[in-house]
């Protein structure tokens, strides 16, 4: 439409610049400052475009090409703005629809998963019950037990029967079994709809039923209030008041009053029943097995018999809606017939349902139940009101909708609180990380003394007493045997030491590694490609250079990526700091010069202060050194109350000023680098603690000992969370080294049995 109007305007301007008629576009110059109406008797009439003579005053201004272009631009801008607004609204609505669809799909998936899980748990519960029955009675639950007790009935004299058919547990099992079969044939949702429909119809006609029902003999007729009983809540209150008045008139009014109120509000009893634990359930099973002697004459039913009869009637009434599903709301309610019609109808329904349950048990393999007709005619239930139906089934349905909107979840059972608390504790334990062996490294010929992980790849470097270092690519694992740990072959062997290799550490970015041995030398190695062929020729460029200066075996190495410095401790009694990247003399400083603390055993850089290094000694001392000052800064209190014990390894916490030491006296001590005080001390193993490693996040500590065990400790509460037996003893030695991967969920251990193991 806009294009037609613009074309008409251009045509009229090109022809004779006639005034704007009624059939043309509005004057674009109307937006000019002189926007007031033109002087004259009035605006242009309807006949302005039909050839009528103009008025005595001047007409509208003639059209011009700039005005037409301005009008077109204005209309185009308005159209684009509306289009953008429409697109934004459309995108917003599409996003909302997509969000709602995704939420609905997620809820359906969650419901399906929960149903599957609960079905699995119910199946496991059935298996456990069968196992318990076999352990207690020595026989399996089979169909051969169905007629075991039928021959024991005696026709003359008192009758013996097993009270199995009326117990709440039996009816509960029957309900669950019938619900399962109904769900398999696809009647679950339909049945729930019918039940909700009938509940609404009953509540809607409550006033009519109250007026039509016959009053109970001996009880006053209840007259409706001024407002009538319009809701389910008023109906329930009215029914409870009538029942209290009826029960108060009898002999045992006080006893029956309490029972009647509880029966009238059955969900209180259900809560107690659901909260019973497994021991109570087992007691009820034993109670069902007890034989009760019934005299030939009819007895007054006790409270327990009434409860059992109530449960049986509830079970029958539970399935009354199956027959009323086709009739709809207008079908007669079987519950009304029990009190207004034939009194034997309840008995016939109960016998019919027991026959159905017996047939289903033949198919499902459930234990048989003995059916004995009750003595005498069943009495009317004391808690049935004048309406003729029981409220046991419908009370929970009227509260918040009940089962109406549950769908597939309607047939699920609820566990008691004790089982729930156990499940919560078990779920907490399930979240704890459990380390399991994944790789076994078998290529060394003697004990492995040290380990070092690659910083970013799944690779491990081992140093052994056989004089070699070996590089392992853990991504190239092969399975040697079925159900066995994966074996890994080394991709490269480093050979240059003249004697056992005692220490190894990774350099910056894992491009270089450094090893120290019994030959008093420190070798710098270039890490080869992890995807190299293990059978390639020897590459002499792998050995970078040698750091010399120590006079005895090098027992410990540590590298600081921050300061690019290498620290070493030797049996000659010194700790040296090296610059491994220097081409000239690379030893920067040496301490202690006097050897007052003895022979160092381990060295480590502190994580919080890169310019500080901590060293441990055989004398049990732990000294903190300042690299900038080149002197001892602080002596930590690492000696225990029982006397000095050799420290085998010292490590630093990755995020706190904390030093951790492993001692020969089976202890682990935590020391504060700021004060030098001992923060915590504990006995960690059954033998000497030989090695330590802290994970990069500072959550747990791993320790190894000569008692052949690895233990993982929580650094929050200093408790052991896992113990692993991974190595065997050799010459009274077991585990020599442990390590944690800097960036992956891998830990490793090495021992005197020439094996290294990796855990995930």
UniProtKB/Swiss-Prot annotation:
<dbReference type="GO" id="GO:0035331">
    <property type="term" value="P:negative regulation of hippo signaling"/>
</dbReference>
<feature type="modified residue" description="Phosphoserine">
    <location>
        <position position="223"/>
    </location>
</feature>
<keyword id="KW-0853">WD repeat</keyword>
<dbReference type="InterPro" id="IPR001680">
    <property type="entry name" value="WD40_rpt"/>
</dbReference>
<feature type="repeat" description="WD 6">
    <location>
        <begin position="684"/>
        <end position="723"/>
    </location>
</feature>
<keyword id="KW-0112">Calmodulin-binding</keyword>
<feature type="compositionally biased region" description="Acidic residues">
    <location>
        <begin position="302"/>
        <end position="317"/>
    </location>
</feature>
<keyword id="KW-0597">Phosphoprotein</keyword>
<feature type="modified residue" description="Phosphoserine">
    <location>
        <position position="276"/>
    </location>
</feature>
<dbReference type="GO" id="GO:0005737">
    <property type="term" value="C:cytoplasm"/>
</dbReference>
<dbReference type="GO" id="GO:0090443">
    <property type="term" value="C:FAR/SIN/STRIPAK complex"/>
</dbReference>
<dbReference type="GO" id="GO:0098978">
    <property type="term" value="C:glutamatergic synapse"/>
</dbReference>
<feature type="region of interest" description="Disordered">
    <location>
        <begin position="1"/>
        <end position="65"/>
    </location>
</feature>
<keyword id="KW-0770">Synapse</keyword>
<feature type="repeat" description="WD 3">
    <location>
        <begin position="549"/>
        <end position="588"/>
    </location>
</feature>
<keyword id="KW-0472">Membrane</keyword>
<feature type="coiled-coil region">
    <location>
        <begin position="69"/>
        <end position="136"/>
    </location>
</feature>
<dbReference type="GO" id="GO:0099159">
    <property type="term" value="P:regulation of modification of postsynaptic structure"/>
</dbReference>
<protein>
    <recommendedName>
        <fullName>Striatin-4</fullName>
    </recommendedName>
</protein>
<dbReference type="InterPro" id="IPR019775">
    <property type="entry name" value="WD40_repeat_CS"/>
</dbReference>
<comment type="subunit">
    <text>Part of the core of STRIPAK complexes composed of PP2A catalytic and scaffolding subunits, the striatins (PP2A regulatory subunits), the striatin-associated proteins MOB4, STRIP1 and STRIP2, PDCD10 and members of the STE20 kinases, such as STK24 and STK26. Interacts with CTTNBP2NL.</text>
</comment>
<feature type="region of interest" description="Caveolin-binding">
    <location>
        <begin position="71"/>
        <end position="79"/>
    </location>
</feature>
<keyword id="KW-0966">Cell projection</keyword>
<feature type="compositionally biased region" description="Gly residues">
    <location>
        <begin position="43"/>
        <end position="54"/>
    </location>
</feature>
<feature type="repeat" description="WD 7">
    <location>
        <begin position="730"/>
        <end position="759"/>
    </location>
</feature>
<feature type="repeat" description="WD 4">
    <location>
        <begin position="595"/>
        <end position="635"/>
    </location>
</feature>
<keyword id="KW-0175">Coiled coil</keyword>
<feature type="repeat" description="WD 2">
    <location>
        <begin position="496"/>
        <end position="535"/>
    </location>
</feature>
<dbReference type="GO" id="GO:0030674">
    <property type="term" value="F:protein-macromolecule adaptor activity"/>
</dbReference>
<feature type="compositionally biased region" description="Acidic residues">
    <location>
        <begin position="272"/>
        <end position="283"/>
    </location>
</feature>
<feature type="region of interest" description="Calmodulin-binding">
    <location>
        <begin position="165"/>
        <end position="182"/>
    </location>
</feature>
<dbReference type="InterPro" id="IPR015943">
    <property type="entry name" value="WD40/YVTN_repeat-like_dom_sf"/>
</dbReference>
<dbReference type="GO" id="GO:0005516">
    <property type="term" value="F:calmodulin binding"/>
</dbReference>
<dbReference type="InterPro" id="IPR020472">
    <property type="entry name" value="G-protein_beta_WD-40_rep"/>
</dbReference>
<feature type="region of interest" description="Disordered">
    <location>
        <begin position="210"/>
        <end position="233"/>
    </location>
</feature>
<dbReference type="GO" id="GO:0016020">
    <property type="term" value="C:membrane"/>
</dbReference>
<dbReference type="Pfam" id="PF00400">
    <property type="entry name" value="WD40"/>
</dbReference>
<dbReference type="GO" id="GO:0098982">
    <property type="term" value="C:GABA-ergic synapse"/>
</dbReference>
<feature type="compositionally biased region" description="Low complexity">
    <location>
        <begin position="7"/>
        <end position="35"/>
    </location>
</feature>
<comment type="function">
    <text>Calmodulin-binding scaffolding protein which is the center of the striatin-interacting phosphatase and kinase (STRIPAK) complexes. STRIPAK complexes have critical roles in protein (de)phosphorylation and are regulators of multiple signaling pathways including Hippo, MAPK, nuclear receptor and cytoskeleton remodeling. Different types of STRIPAK complexes are involved in a variety of biological processes such as cell growth, differentiation, apoptosis, metabolism and immune regulation.</text>
</comment>
<feature type="repeat" description="WD 1">
    <location>
        <begin position="443"/>
        <end position="482"/>
    </location>
</feature>
<feature type="repeat" description="WD 5">
    <location>
        <begin position="642"/>
        <end position="681"/>
    </location>
</feature>
